Amino acid sequence: VLMKVALFIPCYVDQFYPQVGLATVTILEHYGVEHEFPVSQTCCGQPMANSGCMPEAEPLARKFIEVFDGYDYVVAPSGSCAGMIRTHYPDLFADDPAWLERAAALGARTYELMSFLVDVMRYRPTGVTFPATVTYHDSCSGLRELGVHDQPRALLAAVGGLEMKPLEGNDVCCGFGGTFCVKYPAISNAVVSEKADA
C-alpha cells in the first residue's frame, strides 16, 4: 500500500529560500517517496501565534488541517513549522473537541524532513561521499518540540569522507527564533555572531 505524503513548504522557505523547497523535493524523489504538493496550502499560523495573536492563527490552522487532512504524512523542511502543527495546534483548539481531535491527529502525522527520512522511512544515504569537515547546529524547535537530535546525525554519519566536529553549545539558540529575529534584530545578530564564532 502506497502512503500518501504531502509536502508542506513553509512561508519563509517559499518566499526567501525556494531552493530549500526544491532540494526537499529532490531528496524525497531520490528516496522514492511519492508525494503531493497541495496547492491550496497556506501559512501554518506560527508567526501569528509567536506574536501572541492566537485568534488570527486559528483560521489558518483550520485551513491547514482541512488541506492536509487526507494525507498519511505531512513533511516539512522546518522544525519550527512542524512543531507548530504537532505541539501548538492542540492548544489552539483546546475548547473545541472536534477540531482538537483533528489537530492532534494531524500533528501525529506531521514530520520535519530529517525525522521523516530516518524515523518513518528508515533511510540512510548509501554511496554518498562528501570529503569535508562539518558541524551541526540543532534547531531549537526541532530539538525541543519534535525531539529531532539523532536523526540528522545518523544521516550525516552515513556520508563517506565526512568528518563531524562537535559544535560547542550546539543546542543553544542561533538567534533566528521565528519572529524574534524580526522583532529584535540587534539581539538576534549578536546571538548568531556568537554562534558563528564557535
Language-model regions: role of each:
Residues L2-A198:
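Iron-sulfur cluster-binding electron-transfer modules in prokaryotic oxidoreductases
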